[in-house]
Each structure stands twice: as structure tokens, then as C-alpha cells.
């Protein structure tokens, strides 16, 4: 993007955010990068005269229900254009220290739950392009994970509503090192559970999803494009279901091992239940504050425990 266009987008964003908080979802919808400040504010590092620019309050994307409390990473939002309107595809907080996402957040709702696009062709190279919003702070396209696979967080199958939406899930900022065994069996069971629930209008009006892996509790460190990158010891998911005025939440905590095997369909839900926990418990394990934009009383209630029956488990 040219300097002129970035500056124009920056001025537009300022105007919209000052005009009305309800309009701010239309700000910066092609996913430009912002640095999260310790006080929860952001600045656009590409804006002209950035040293003189006052931080912009994160009143927009950080206010969405799926967005966890931000830390000191790089906040990125990727959007697509659907039916002449912008649509948030997913968001993430990137850790430049680890060259991996701290988390990736997205939602299933009436606008994106349709399945109309196929998976990106394996013939397209790079298969996993560099995130265009990270520049030198991110990993290069198709950077090898040295024996580990590129494990999606926002899965390819999570975003089948358009070609652009699916393609964006292949950015290097949306993948973490996963063993082929884990990526092809155990993780798929949890991904499929989320996709089935997210695409069911009878189950949820909106299903909010956050996924990640542990960056400090690791199996090992590997060298990727000259950088030290951790291989998470655990992967996790945080889910929030909204149906009418009813809220329920659920967490998953799954060890990243190499010895998983395929299991019969009748054993999948019991296995998922064994790895389920409350959001409060997941927050303790990850150090991440999930769903902080819920009303306080709702947040306390839905995060304290989970109902297996509410999730069909």
C-alpha cells in the first residue's frame, strides 16, 4: 500500500472513530497493522510522522466479543469484502519475540457460516504466504518448520464462505508448528466440533472462537528462517456461544503429542469432553483474559463453569 493511501486510511480511521463508535467496524478493513501499547492503545507504525502521532484508542476491533485482552504484541485484523461490504475474517495478536501468534480470534455467524469455496489449491505457491501486514517482523512465505507441519489456528475449513476468506487463513501469522500426527488426527476432531457447532443456526446465532498454543510451555525450540521459534506443548480453544439472550462458554486444552490415533465416531465426543474445561481454568493455564467485553456479570457466570449438555457432550 502506498504511503499516500496509508495516510488517507489513517485520516479516515481517525474521523470515523471520533464520529461514532458504532461505525468503527468499517475502519481499516483491509487489515493494516497496529502496535498494541501497554495501556491498551495502538498506533499505526506506517503513518507519516508516527513519532508525533498520538496513540489511537482501540475502540473498534478490541471491543468485539471474540477479542481477548491485549498484551504487548502486534494486533492484526484481516477482512474481506462480501456483497459490497467489508467483513472481518479473523484477528490475531502476534508475538514478535516468538514469531508466532499469541492467539487468533474469529466468529461463525450468518454472514460467514456458508460453505461456498474450496480449500486453497495445493499447487499454489507459496502455500503459506507471509502476512502482508507484518513485513520483516513476520516469517517469510513457506518458511520450513523443520519437520513440523504448518498447523492452522483459524482453520482453512473454518473459512469456506469465500475464496479470499479461505486464502487469508494460509498466512504464516495464522499457523504454528504442529506434528503431522497431531495436526491430522487429534486437532482435527476439535476443529470439526467447532465447525459443526458454528455452522448450525439452531445451535448458535454466533459462535465466538479463540485458538492458540502455549508460547512459554514448549516441547522444543526450532530454527525457522534464522529465528528461534517455539513448538507449543499444548494447544487450546476458547468458545463462546450466543443464542438469543443465552450465553455459554467452553474451553479445550490438548497436549501436543505424536502418538494420537484415529478413534471411532462414537468415541469422539467423550474424548473431547475429557479435554474440556471452564474458561476460568483456561485463563489460569494460558494467562490470557478471554471474552473481556462481555458484561461483567455474564462473564463471571459463563466463565466459572461449563455445561456438557449445552454443548452436546
Segments predicted by a language model, with ranges:
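Bacterial N-terminal signal peptides that target proteins for export
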Residues: 2-11
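Alpha-helical transmembrane segments
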Residues: 14-18
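C-terminal motif of bacterial Sec signal peptides marking the signal peptidase cleavage site
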Residues: 19-23
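Domain-level detector for secreted/extracellular nuclease and nuclease-toxin modules, and
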Residues: 24-313
Amino acid at each position: 500500500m502506498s504511503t499516500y493511501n496509508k495516510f488517507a486510511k489513517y485520516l479516515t480511521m481517525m474521523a470515523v472513530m471520533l464520529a461514532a463508535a458504532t461505525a468503527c467496524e468499517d475502519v481499516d478493513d483491509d487489515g493494516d497493522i497496529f502496535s498494541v501499547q501497554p495501556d491498551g492503545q495502538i498506533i499505526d507504525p506506517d503513518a507519516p510522522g508516527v513519532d508525533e502521532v498520538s496513540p489511537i484508542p482501540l475502540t473498534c476491533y478490541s471491543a468485539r466479543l471474540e477479542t481477548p485482552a491485549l498484551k504487548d504484541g502486534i494486533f492484526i485484523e484481516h477482512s474481506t469484502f462480501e456483497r459490497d461490504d467489508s467483513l472481518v475474517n479473523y484477528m490475531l495478536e502476534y508475538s514478535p519475540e516468538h514469531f508466532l501468534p499469541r492467539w487468533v480470534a474469529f466468529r461463525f455467524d450468518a454472514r460467514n457460516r456458508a460453505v461456498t469455496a474450496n480449500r486453497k489449491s495445493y499447487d499454489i505457491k507459496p502455500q503459506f504466504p507471509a502476512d502482508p501486514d507484518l513485513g520483516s517482523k513476520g516469517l517469510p512465505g513457506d518458511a520450513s518448520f523443520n519437520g513440523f507441519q504448518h498447523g492452522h489456528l483459524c482453520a482453512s475449513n473454518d473459512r469456506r464462505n469465500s475464496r479470499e476468506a479461505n486464502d487469508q487463513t494460509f498466512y504464516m501469522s495464522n499457523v504454528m508448528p504442529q506434528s503431522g500426527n497431531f495436526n491430522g488426527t487429534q486437532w482435527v476432531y476439535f476443529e470439526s466440533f467447532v465447525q459443526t457447532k458454528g455452522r448450525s443456526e439452531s445451535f448458535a446465532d454466533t459462535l465466538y472462537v479463540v485458538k492458540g498454543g502455549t508460547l512459554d510451555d514448549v516441547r522444543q525450540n526450532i530454527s525457522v528462517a534464522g529465528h528461534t521459534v517455539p513448538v507449543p506443548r499444548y494447544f487450546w480453544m476458547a468458545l463462546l456461544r450466543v443464542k438469543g439472550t443465552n450465553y455459554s462458554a467452553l474451553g479445550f486444552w490438548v497436549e501436543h503429542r505424536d502418538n494420537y490415533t484415529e478413534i471411532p465416531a462414537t468415541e469422539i465426543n467423550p474424548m473431547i469432553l475429557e479435554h474440556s474445561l471452564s474458561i476460568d481454568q483456561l485463563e489460569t493455564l494460558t494467562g490470557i483474559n478471554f471474552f473481556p467485553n462481555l458484561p461483567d456479570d455474564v462473564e463471571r457466570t459463563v466463565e466459572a463453569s461449563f455445561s456438557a449438555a449445552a454443548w452436546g457432550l
